[in-house]
């Protein structure tokens, strides 16, 4: 099964965004199978804690260009959860990844969030991933709150804090767009 890393870049003044996806098969791959990108307009402004309102429509539009039945994982440059409730999964506050999971309605599709910064009150099911010589972790969470994906992220190709294919998704969203 394939995996896709999705990232976006936005030009506020022009109200344009570019959403890019890097498609790969195995966690250790050093090159993508494919790259896809779309240009979007009329996106919402960034609001802390409601990042999904800006990102979700473009991500869904990008995913319309692939056969999701051939994918088992979507990786986002974002948190899946913003707040975790110890007693109830249903009481947890959804982040971009959880909103995407709900929108897609595919129980067999895993959503992993990889964030460069910690989000307050999101420590119960967020795992730290130290890569390379970095003293700063990546923060990894998933739709399956109890599953620790930090080891698979650590196994991804690249010597630095951010795995090569994740960095490539960021770069791809800016190529011919900045």
Stretches with model-predicted labels:
Residues 14-28:
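Acidic, metal-ligating active-site segments
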Residues 1-6, 34-50, 56-69, 73, ...:
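C-terminal binding/interaction regions
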Residues 4-17:
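N-terminal beta1-alpha1 ligand-phosphate binding loop
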Residues 25-37:
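Short, compositionally biased "basic patch" segments
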Residues 83-106:
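Short Gly/Thr/Asp-enriched flexible loops that form oxyanion-binding sites at enzyme active sites
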Residues 54-61, 91-97:
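Short acidic (Asp/Glu) patches
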